[in-house]
Amino acid sequence: MTKADTIFKENIECILKEGVFSEQARPKYKDGTVANSKYVTGAFSEYDLSKGEFPITTLRPIAIKSAIKEVLWIYQDQSNSLEVLNDKYNVHYWNDWEVGDTGTIGERYGAVVKKHDIINKLLKQLETNPWNRRNIISLWDYQAFEETDGLLPCAFQTMFDVRRVDGEIYLDATLTQRSNDMLVAHHINAMQYVALQMMIAKHFGWKVGKFFYFINNLHIYDNQFEQAQELLRREPSNCQPRLVLNVPDGTNFFDIKAEDFELVDYDPVKPQLKFDLAI
């Protein structure tokens, strides 16, 4: 069993046994009913990517390519346009969060990255002094939240540090997430930011190091308990999945494409489970 599968099952069991139910919940299912959830607070996990530990479960298939394309939309295109996401990347799951008829998700994610020139500033800081303790991406912008409607960012802060070990520089990353749908989005979000970490490491010719993942509110929606039990019953696949970025060291961050990533030794348990999403 991979480390990710162990953590996945432990988190599911913890939520089901020790979690509490939400109150005054904002999300709704497509039929208009309130989407309550059972949750725990302060969930933390750690993966050493340099040792082949990746935060992706084998207990069900994870759509890794779409997840990586979303990261490119946010940090390369620096866009909030659904047209860009749909037409350039053929990714459509954000359409349910369109703000009115704007064709956007509001001033969120990529729009905030562009507004503050976040990724260019980060790369410049890492180039100038990678050992400084201020290499942070933050998508939490109160002014933007007041200016437009839209879903507030779930994965909103990423911090980066470097370590020199045996002459090699390793890039570590810490992702902080305010809210996470454990069964649907947990491994998607984690692998998205592992991909971002790998892109930045490649830009500088560094090794990928450790990935730390903190979630403030980790939950299972009240229409997912049957799927949760099914995941607990499943035996994990006998594989060791890992994400590979097939570009040379020193490849410019903005030149990396979704097709450059390869998920190897990944044979997840099937069939896929179905989930009705909360919007």
Curated annotation (Swiss-Prot):
Judging by the UniProt lineage, the source's domain of life is Bacteria
Under InterPro entries, the record lists:
Thymidate_synth/dCMP_Mease, Thymidate_synth/dCMP_Mease_dom, Thymidate_synth/dCMP_Mease_sf, Thymidylate_synthase, Thymidylate_synthase_AS
- UniProt keyword annotation of RNA-binding present: no
State the Gene Ontology BP annotations. Answer: dTMP biosynthetic process; dTTP biosynthetic process; methylation
Which residue windows are transmembrane per the record?
Answer: none
Which Gene3D superfamilies does this UniProt record tie to the protein?
Thymidylate synthase/dCMP hydroxymethylase domain
The catalytic site is made up of: C154 (nucleophile)
Asked if the Swiss-Prot or TrEMBL record annotates the protein with the keyword Lyase, the reply is no
- Quote the record's binding site residues for dUMP: R133, R134, R178, S179, N180, D181, N189, H219, I220, Y221
Q: Which residues form a coiled coil?
A: none
According to UniProt, the name of this protein is Thymidylate synthase
State the taxonomy lineage: Bacteria, Bacillati, Bacillota, Bacilli, Lactobacillales
